[in-house]
């Protein structure tokens, strides 16, 4: 059971939540506001974990992740060189073995994935990935905490992301410069919701809330899917 869960998290979790070695911002919560928490940095952390675990997977799962890792590393060539320090020697060696193994085909399969417990959807083809962030009575419009992501009010109001060959699009100060009231894909009244008054932590941590709506999610058939969100905004 533990083995099955491990493989599910790696293959269906990490394998569905990254693009060319980048962790999708739609899945990162308030960490999008951290300079140290870019999709490049988060993706590197995930790839290190996968390399540590890859030889513990079953043959089928291992074959899938070897192909995926080789593809990500080829598309993100700075990853291996960035593995510095004694603690990364074995990981760097394994990464180079994968890259130099001609029997491993670098590939990532197309997919459409609905993360029903997170109210997210991902559609991935060879040359792009499209993601949608939603929220419902189960999830919040954003995550505001510890003085982080203070203007994230509309991040899950149907915000859309398109990842393509520009790997710096969401890494190069995107969240510092984008208009938080006019996020891509959203149709909202551009209101500064604020963060309320400070609580016992000393931080004002309001501005995030669940929706009153339950009709949020999608259906998937193979690599095709459809998503929808009943949206009522703040109340």
Give the residues covered by each predicted segment.
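Generic structural signal for hydrophobic core residues of well-folded globular domains
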Residues: 50-57, 72
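Catalytic and substrate-binding regions of extracellular carbohydrate-active enzymes
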Residues: 64-235
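Structural helix-adjacent loops and short alpha-helical linkers that scaffold large soluble proteins
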Residues: 2-4, 54-67, 97
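Alpha-helix boundary/N-cap detector
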Residues: 37-41, 45, 60, 64, ...
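Aromatic-lined, polymer-binding surfaces characteristic
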Residues: 1-52
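Conserved aromatic-histidine-acidic binding/catalytic patches
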Residues: 34-38, 57, 121
């Amino acid at each position: 059971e533990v083995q099955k869960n491990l493989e599910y998290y790696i293959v269906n979790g990490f394998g569905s939540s990254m693009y060319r070695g980048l962790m999708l911002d739609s899945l990162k919560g308030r960490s999008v506001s951290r300079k140290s928490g870019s999709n490049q940095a988060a993706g590197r952390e995930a790839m290190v974990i996968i390399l540590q675990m890859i030889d513990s997977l079953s043959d089928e799962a291992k074959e899938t992740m070897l192909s995926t890792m080789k593809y990500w590393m080829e598309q993100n060539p700075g990853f291996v060189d960035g593995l510095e320090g004694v603690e990364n020697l074995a990981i760097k060696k394994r990464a180079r073995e994968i890259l130099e193994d001609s029997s491993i085909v670098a590939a990532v399969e197309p997919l459409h994935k609905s993360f029903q417990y997170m109210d997210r959807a991902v559609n991935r083809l060879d040359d792009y990935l499209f993601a949608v962030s939603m929220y419902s009575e189960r999830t919040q419009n954003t995550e505001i905490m510890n003085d982080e992501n203070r203007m994230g009010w509309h991040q899950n109001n149907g915000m859309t992301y398109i990842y393509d060959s520009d790997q710096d699009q969401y890494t190069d100060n995107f969240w510092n410069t984008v208009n938080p009231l006019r996020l891509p894909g959203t149709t909202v009244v551009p209101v500064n919701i604020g963060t309320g008054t400070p609580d016992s932590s000393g931080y004002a941590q309001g501005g995030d809330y669940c929706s009153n709506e339950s009709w949020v999610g999608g259906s998937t058939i193979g690599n095709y899917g459809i998503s929808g969100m009943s949206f009522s905004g703040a109340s």
